[in-house]
Amino acid sequence: MTTKHDVKTFQGFIMTLQEYWAQQGCAIVQPLDMEVGAGTFHPMTFLRSLGPEPMSSAYVQPSRRPTDGRYGENPNRLQHYYQFQVVLKPSPSNMQELYLGSLEALGVDMNVHDVRFVEDNWESPTLGAWGLGWEIWLNGMEVSQFTYFQQVGGLECKPVTGEITYGLERLAMYIQEVDSVYDLVWTDGPLGKVMYGDIFHQNEVEQSTYNFEHADVDVQFKMFDDCEQACQRLLALEKPLPLPAYEQVMKASHAFNLLDARHAISVTERQRYILRVRTMAKGVAEAYYQAREALGFPMCK
């Protein structure tokens, strides 16, 4: 595939992936407008993996992991970063070839570079999800994750959904041949180069300070409890509302992550909180499946 985008910029790199996967039949959807720890939390992955309805999509997802912040001092550890998520349901038999084709679209020559699939089964305890998977290494560095979902929200995936997750910054650093994420060229236009650091370095410094030092522990504990109660209430309605309930799951999960960054939760409590999120996610998954079933699984027609 030829592309008109400059893959030596972060902007062009993302646009190339979007164009490639659009040509493979994916709906290019937009990022979720909430704090999530990974692209898997997006409803297009978590909820659309449930039930028999086919769906292929791809999207960029800003992801937040408060404990990974380093005050902007580490060249490759960030509390806010980007994933590119591809969801293929049912999973095609040539998923590996499609992925390699995306690397070629980004200018990675398979005859020159060493691409390896290293077995690494995936699990998300908070989402009650797991799958058979592989890390994808490019010249010895992990750049993507490849997963065949077996279970989501405690429900078996029929058919199996295939997921590809690209670590955008890490792969872009390789393509641009830079050692620091802040040295990535975001775009190069009439006003000159705009660097990743120009856009995000101050955010990393300030958000790390907030996550580790100023996030109000009492507020976050209350937020978690309030979200849990709201989720339970929405699922207990005569006609449950799984989509709004799922938003409460994501809010509770982020509150938990902030409490984790503040070291406000003991090891024992940590497992209890993870179980509480998983219980919410399982309730949402069951309600969503039942709602789609009541509609007659319309996308199967």
UniProtKB/Swiss-Prot annotation:
Organism: Shewanella halifaxensis (strain HAW-EB4)
Sample GO molecular function, one term: ATP binding
A single BP term in Gene Ontology: glycyl-tRNA aminoacylation
EC supergroup of this enzyme: ligase
Family: Belongs to the class-II aminoacyl-tRNA synthetase family.
Disulfide bonds: none
UniProt-recorded name of the protein: Glycine--tRNA ligase alpha subunit
Domain of life: Bacteria
Gene Ontology cellular component list: cytosol
Reaction catalysis annotation: tRNA(Gly) + glycine + ATP = glycyl-tRNA(Gly) + AMP + diphosphate
Keyword Nucleotide-binding set for record: yes
EC number: 6.1.1.14
Quaternary organization: Tetramer of two alpha and two beta subunits.
Subcellular location: Cytoplasm
The entry's keywords: Aminoacyl-tRNA synthetase, ATP-binding, Cytoplasm, Ligase, Nucleotide-binding, Protein biosynthesis
